[in-house]
């Protein structure tokens, strides 16, 4: 019985590799921008699975670019330093003291943890913030009522080109400065990932989230919509099917597709090896939004 089980396991592995082959061939040399955050960042086993997925993508010739958040660790440090955390309209209100913590955590801690984790697997990862080389230029979000919360004013992809050409994996924190006064701003990592994907003419934008994807019924995890056209995604927002925290993620995908990204994916980062399951299998595991059929 044990030998039979082993043969079945071996056959499954071979089948998975066989299914992945055409995708590996198709995406070799292509750029995929991945927003990494949520549960996949908070839990050690999921974190390890993401690092292995990224290492494998790089190993087979895909050019991954990682953009990360770090909300839970920011909250922990704010609490430790007795700085109150405030959220408004789903965004962190960021005064000067909070921004110091955000920059310390995202640039100095989380970014280096990801870089070190990837490098341990033989991946050549390089840590950057949006401020480095003016990779991302920020502008104040809205009317400035949220303090040092920013939006993307401009992306300079030339900073990343030599790294990608030489096989490095850029790991980017979503902190960037305004060009007029050089003040650091906290930008939503989904937004940074989407704008980078467009500027890099990426094949895919992938958002790791804490939900299965876009749901037809937000209270039913089995109502996953596996594929949408750009026009259908817009309609779901208008109809209120996409609401709450899924709205900015879907809008991020829409903007990226409108600027030339081939496909955008919203996937469940709580599933081990979600990246490989989405990129290298026929069924995928999340929602894929495409510009056309």
Swiss-Prot record:
InterPro entries: AceGlu_kinase-like_sf, AcgluKinase_fam, ArgB, Asp/Glu/Uridylate_kinase, Glu/AcGlu_kinase, NAGK-C. It catalyses: N-acetyl-L-glutamate + ATP = N-acetyl-L-glutamyl 5-phosphate + ADP. SUPFAM superfamilies: Carbamate kinase-like. Its EC number is 2.7.2.8. Keywords: Amino-acid biosynthesis, Arginine biosynthesis, ATP-binding, Cytoplasm, Kinase, Nucleotide-binding, Transferase. GO terms for biological process: arginine biosynthetic process via ornithine; L-arginine biosynthetic process. The record marks 35, 249 as: Transition state stabilizer. It is found in: Cytoplasm. It is an enzyme of class 2 (transferase). One of its GO terms (molecular function) is ATP binding. Substrate binds at residues 70-71, 92, 186. This is Acetylglutamate kinase. The gene is argB.
């Amino acid at each position: 019985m044990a030998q039979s089980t082993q043969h079945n396991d071996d056959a499954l592995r071979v089948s998975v590799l066989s299914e992945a082959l055409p995708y590996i061939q198709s995406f070799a040399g292509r750029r995929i921008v991945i927003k990494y955050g949520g549960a996949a960042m908070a839990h050690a086993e999921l974190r390890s699975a993401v690092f292995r997925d990224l290492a494998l993508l790089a190993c087979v010739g895909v050019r991954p670019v990682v953009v990360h958040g770090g909300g839970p660790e920011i909250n922990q440090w704010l609490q430790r330093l007795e700085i109150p955390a405030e959220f408004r309209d789903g965004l962190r209100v960021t005064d000067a003291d909070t921004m110091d913590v955000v920059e310390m955590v995202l640039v100095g801690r989380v970014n280096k943890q990801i870089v070190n984790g990837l490098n341990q697997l033989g991946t050549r990862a390089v840590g950057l913030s949006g401020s480095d080389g003016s990779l991302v230029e920020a502008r104040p979000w809205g009317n400035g009522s949220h303090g040092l919360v920013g939006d993307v004013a401009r992306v300079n992809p030339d900073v990343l080109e030599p790294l990608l050409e030489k096989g490095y994996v850029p790991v980017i924190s979503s902190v960037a400065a305004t060009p007029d006064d050089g003040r650091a701003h906290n930008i939503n990592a989904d937004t940074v990932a989407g704008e980078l994907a467009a500027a890099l003419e990426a094949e895919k934008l992938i958002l790791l989230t804490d939900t299965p994807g876009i749901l037809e019924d937000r209270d039913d995890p089995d109502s996953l919509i596996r594929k949408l056209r750009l026009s259908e995604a817009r309609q779901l927002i208008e109809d209120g099917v996409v609401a709450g925290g899924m709205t900015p993620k879907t809008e991020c995908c829409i903007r990226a597709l409108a600027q030339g990204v081939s496909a955008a994916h919203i996937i469940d980062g709580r599933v081990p090896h979600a990246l490989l399951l989405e990129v290298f299998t026929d069924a995928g595991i999340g929602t894929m939004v495409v510009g056309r059929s």
